[in-house]
């Protein structure tokens, strides 16, 4: 039996001190990337010390999802708020490597390591 994949991402935000952790579940593509981007920018508006985006439950992301993360990164740099990505699944990690964005983003194996920085 094929496992159902969450088609629309669900983002849950929790706070670890001054650090915001955004845990995302589901695929991120053109049909939902605008909503995803809005959620990320709303977290930035709360002025966290850092933002960690937990992508461990995201099996697929297309270029629109990456564009949302790039927009967050651009705005966060202006606000001096570090953005870290954590838990990228193999398929998503490959996308970041192919586009060389693994050299642009801080990427960690899991949230614990990202928060330790």
PLM regions: where:
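Short, charge-rich amphipathic segments
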Residues: 1-9, 48-51
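Short acidic-hydrophobic, aromatic-tinged amphipathic segments that line or gate anion-handling sites
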Residues: 106-110
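Amphipathic alpha-helical interaction surfaces in cytosolic regulatory modules
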Residues: 27-105
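Short secondary-structure boundary/capping segments
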Residues: 2-3, 12-14, 75, 97
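STAS-typified acidic loop motif
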Residues: 4, 9-38
């Amino acid at each position: 039996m094929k496992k159902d994949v969450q088609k629309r991402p669900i983002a849950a935000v929790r706070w670890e001190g001054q650090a915001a952790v955004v845990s995302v579940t589901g695929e991120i593509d053109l049909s939902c990337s605008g909503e995803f981007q809005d959620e990320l920018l709303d977290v930035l508006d709360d002025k966290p010390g850092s933002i960690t985006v937990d992508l461990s439950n995201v099996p697929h992301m297309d270029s629109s999802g990456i564009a949302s993360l790039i927009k967050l990164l651009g705005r966060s740099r202006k606000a001096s708020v570090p953005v870290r990505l954590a838990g990228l699944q193999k398929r998503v990690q490959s996308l970041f490597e192919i586009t060389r964005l693994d050299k642009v983003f801080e990427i960690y194996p899991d949230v614990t390591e990202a928060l330790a920085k």
